[in-house]
């Protein structure tokens, strides 16, 4: 297996979970993950922040605030909802993951926040959302607490 750092975009297209983990491991801690928030205005106008961080050296891209039911990535060309992740992967050539947030039953959010940052149903760590994310093409899921 190649080290992650020696892989090309076409290598990532065909990688399965085990191969991706082995490639990361073989890179001995030299893989950089960068988190972006797709609902925010892009730093470069019509270029997504995911593309921007990839151009700056991010090896893997983590999308925060990504709602699997209502995906929004500012700066992305018109794309069907279920194809948003695949489009980001195509544009960046990088593995792409999302954050999902565990939530206690009966709670709407893990923190008090304003409406913009309020936890939506498509961002909660549920089996259904994880399955939807995988169907959309995510390479990894991070369980997080914002």
Task: Tell what function each PLM region has.
Residues 45-69, 74-76, 109-146:
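Alpha/beta enzyme core
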Residues 22-23, 43, 50-51, 85-87, ...:
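Short, flexible, glycine/charge-rich loop motifs used to bind or transfer phosphoryl groups or to couple energy/partner
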Residues 29, 35-54:
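Active-site-flanking structural segment that lines cofactor/substrate pockets
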Residues 66, 80-102, 108-124:
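A generic, well-ordered mixed alpha/beta core segment in the N-terminal half of proteins
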Residues 1-4, 8-21, 42-43, 63, ...:
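Glycan-processing catalytic domains of CAZymes
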Residues 1-37, 81-93, 97-99:
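N-terminal amphipathic alpha-helix/helix-capping segment at the start of soluble metabolic enzymes
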């Amino acid at each position: 297996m190649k080290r992650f750092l020696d892989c090309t975009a076409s290598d990532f297209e065909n990688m399965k979970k085990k191969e991706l983990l082995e490639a990361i491991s073989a890179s001995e801690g030299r893989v950089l993950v960068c988190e972006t928030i797709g609902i925010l205005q892009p730093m470069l106008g019509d270029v997504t922040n995911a593309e921007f961080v990839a151009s700056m050296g991010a090896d893997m891209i983590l999308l925060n605030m990504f709602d699997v039911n209502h995906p929004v990535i500012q700066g992305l060309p018109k794309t069907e909802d279920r194809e948003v992740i695949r489009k980001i992967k195509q544009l960046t050539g990088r593995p792409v993951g999302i954050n999902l947030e565990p939530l206690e039953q009966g709670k709407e959010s893990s923190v008090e926040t304003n409406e913009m940052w309020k936890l939506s149903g498509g961002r909660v760590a549920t089996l259904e959302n994880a399955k939807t994310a995988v169907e959309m093409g995510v390479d990894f899921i991070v369980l997080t607490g914002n």
